[in-house]
Each structure stands twice: as C-alpha cells, then as structure tokens.
C-alpha cells in the first residue's frame, strides 16, 4: 500500500509498504518513507528512506554445475539480497536569476549479495560483505523568461566500495589481480562507477521552427576488471583504471509542415576515443539525419482533454 498524508501545512509525506511471498525464500517486506517541507514558495527540503529486496533468480538456482545443491546445500540456503537507501536534498528557485538549483546527499547499502567467488567456494551463495555508495548530486536549470536560450547542468560524486572483491576475507581466500592497493580510492570502488561525472546541455531556439542543443559530459577515471587479453599475472585478470574522457553531441530539429520534423545530429563531435568497459571501445564521430512525423504533443494532448471536459 501507499499512504500519502499532510500532517502540517508545509509538510508532505508518504509511507509505502510492500510484502512479497517467494516460493523458496519465503515472505520478505520492503518499504519507503518520504518527507518534503516547504520553506517558502520557491524552496523545500526533502528526504527519503527506503528498504528493498531482490529474490534469487533462476540463474542463481541453476548456475551450471556450481549450484548450491550440487555442493551439498539446499535451495532454501539462498536468501534474498537486501538494500537500504537514504537521501537528503534541498531545492530552490532564484527568481531574480531564473535559476533552479538542487543538491542531494545520498547513501546506499547492499548486503547478502548473491555471487560466486573464492569465499563462497565458487558456488552461487550469499556473501557477507556490504557494498556501499555515498555521495552528492548537484543540478541546475537556467531558463530565462522570454529568452531563446536555456542551460541544464549537473555534477555527481560517488564514493563506492565493492565488497564482492575487496573485503578482507575474499582477498585472503584467493590471490588475484582484483582490488589491489595502490593508494587510490578507485582501487576498491565499484566496477564501472566513476567517482566524478559532469553533464551539461545548452538549448537554443534559433527560430520557432528551428531548435538546437549542444550537450557535453565528463566522466572521471573508472575501475574495471581485466581479462585474459591483458597479460601479466593472474592470467591477465588484473584490475584496470579506465581513463577519463569528454564527449560532446549536437542535436538540431526543424519543423517542416503538418507535424513532420527533420533532425540532424552529430555524436561525439571531437571524435574522442574512450572506453566505458575495458577493451570495448565506444563509437567515434557519427552523423545522423532523419525525418519523423509527430502525431501529437503533450500540449496538444492537454488541450484535447480540456476541450473534451468542457464539452461534457
């Protein structure tokens, strides 16, 4: 169920609870609580706390010849994964600057992870470690009234920890090239989760018919696993640090007639070479041109509903 209530004039809150019955694991509960307090007409403080659950999948129960049953256990030995999340944020709108700003602090924890590694004897089982992520998100929208230009921007910092490969008992049970200590926070970070990420987008209305936008993003250095092609120790499975990169994209649209719209896009304008996963290169510079038909828009849909309601 989901219950929404307003205990005070400026305080809004919700409370949700869910109960799931699994044929093997049994009944598990999850839920979420949210609060929002209006400071004035333009600002508010918000927060939420939630607890989630993920039941074992068929893959976890039938992992080749490495199922828990094949190793002398029972299916009932596999428990659900559990997660907790908390965030605290502040939103405001600055009238004199036509600027919307938002800041959010967050933290998440995942435990009882289902995985197969040395400390589980290479059988799908629940590990004892706790994966964590915490950080801050900053975002803003600058949209001047009666102007042709607007700007969106955001920044995310994530300090994460990968318990699956970096907990002491895992490192003591098996020697490999994962989670080596070199004095960097990335050594124990979650795989493919950058510590720093920035994104921005400039929108410009050249005319009522022609619109364009230039977007860019920066992704900081990221940890990833090695593979058999890497070479060196541990059969090549040595952690890799993917380089940071910048990517810029251009999108333009032109309204032709009767709902038809022409689009012209340039992806990765600077032809940046980068990897989001180790030894998997991303696309270089691309050009796309197309024509599409728009049968309805959000504004038109609202007007149609208003006309229908007024006629009734």
State where each predicted segment sits:
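Conserved C-terminal beta-signal and adjacent last beta-strands/turns
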Residues: 47, 142, 186-312
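Residue-level signature of outer-membrane beta-barrel architecture
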Residues: 3-5, 19, 27, 37-38, ...
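Transmembrane beta-barrel architecture of outer-membrane proteins
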Residues: 19-31, 49-53, 80-86, 105-111, ...
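Outer-membrane beta-barrel signature, preferentially recognizing the C-terminal barrel domain
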Residues: 38, 42-44, 51-110, 117-144, ...
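Solvent-exposed loop segments that connect transmembrane elements
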Residues: 59-75, 115-124, 162-187, 223-240, ...
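Transmembrane beta-barrel strands of outer-membrane/channel proteins
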Residues: 15-19, 47-51, 60, 90, ...
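Surface-exposed extracellular loop regions of Gram-negative outer-membrane beta-barrel proteins
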Residues: 1-22, 26-32, 36, 146, ...
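Gram-negative outer-membrane beta-barrel transporters
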Residues: 6-10, 98-109, 127-228, 261, ...
């Amino acid at each position: 169920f989901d219950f929404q209530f307003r205990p005070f004039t400026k305080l809004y809150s919700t409370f949700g609870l869910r109960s799931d019955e699994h044929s093997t694991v049994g009944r598990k509960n999850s839920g979420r609580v949210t609060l929002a307090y209006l400071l004035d007409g333009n600002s508010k403080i918000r927060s939420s706390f939630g607890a989630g659950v993920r039941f074992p999948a068929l893959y976890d129960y039938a992992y080749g010849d490495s199922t828990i049953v094949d190793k002398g256990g029972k299916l009932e030995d596999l428990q659900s994964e559990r997660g907790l999340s908390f965030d605290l944020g502040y939103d405001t709108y600055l009238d004199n600057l036509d600027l919307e700003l938002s800041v959010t602090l967050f933290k998440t924890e995942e435990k009882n992870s289902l995985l197969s590694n040395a400390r589980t004897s290479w059988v799908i089982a629940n590990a004892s470690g706790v994966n964590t992520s915490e950080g801050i998100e900053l975002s803003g929208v600058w949209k001047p009234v009666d102007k042709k230009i607007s700007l969106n921007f955001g920044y995310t910092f994530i300090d994460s920890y990968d318990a699956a490969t970096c907990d002491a008992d895992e490192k003591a049970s098996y020697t490999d090239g994962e989670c080596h200590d070199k004095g960097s926070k990335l050594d124990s970070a979650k795989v493919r989760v950058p510590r720093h990420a920035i994104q921005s987008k400039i929108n410009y209305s050249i005319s009522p018919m022609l619109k364009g936008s230039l977007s860019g993003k920066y992704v900081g250095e990221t940890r990833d696993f090695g593979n058999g092609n890497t070479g060196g120790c541990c059969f090549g499975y040595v952690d890799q640090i993917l380089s940071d990169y910048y990517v810029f994209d251009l999108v333009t649209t032109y309204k032709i007639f009767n709902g038809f719209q022409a689009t012209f896009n340039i992806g990765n304008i600077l032809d940046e070479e980068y990897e989001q996963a180790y030894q998997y290169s991303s696309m270089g510079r691309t050009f796309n041109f197309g024509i599409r038909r728009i049968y309805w828009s959000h504004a038109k849909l609202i007007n149609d509903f208003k006309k229908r309601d007024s006629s009734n």
